[in-house]
């Protein structure tokens, strides 16, 4: 078995395994092409890792395709969650926090360290210390700052009591080198959702911004797209006539992906105090 992009799968295969299948954008044509090249297709997907309205790889859409084309299929759910170092209880708790609007403390059993920080610069110092000790560490943030596509520009600037927190986004090119890198300059480049999908590190720092806030009065999540600087994402919402519930789901999915990239520790800085208090109360850290 050899890896290949979906449009480069050679013909005459017995089996094709599609990882990150929730990210497929043209499901009908993609699967039609694959079934011309393989007898069996296994798709590995997660509805809650879809982050754009154009991504069509949902369980329901795969089932509909199979039924339309008379293809027999089986749906199997993983019994354990490999993400976050097999710390499935953390992922389950996160799902209850985000999707079930859990508003009572959970009895967290995960060994994953969760820690809240008051100052981004203190957190940055801690992450650099972890990296100097041999840990694979990364910064992540939602797409809430413009991206100049230059690692020499500090696109992310956040005022702090001890001085401004300033970072560049991760490089547009040489992303693999950034992913593998464990030098100080790699931690000075913040990853976004598009450089988080499918990846895993020892420790991460996450900036929780105002695009997702907890509203205590309504006991619900509030989405503020005015905070989002991803022009392609926002325009695709309009183009696809995305409903309010669909927008909420995609933003929640984005934070779910960002918060599940670590095996040992997740360090979070919150812009909004009410959101911070709610998340800490539910997850118990």
Segments and roles (model prediction):
Residues 1-37, 188-192, 254:
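Conserved RecA-like ASCE ATPase "motif II neighborhood" in helicase/translocase motors
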Residues 52-57, 69-93, 99-221, 248:
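Conserved helicase/translocase motor-coupling segment
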Residues 42, 186-285:
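C-terminal accessory regions
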Residues 8-12, 35-36, 129-136, 260:
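Flexible, charged surface loops at secondary-structure boundaries
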Residues 58-67, 153-160, 277-285:
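Short, aromatic/basic amphipathic alpha-helical patches
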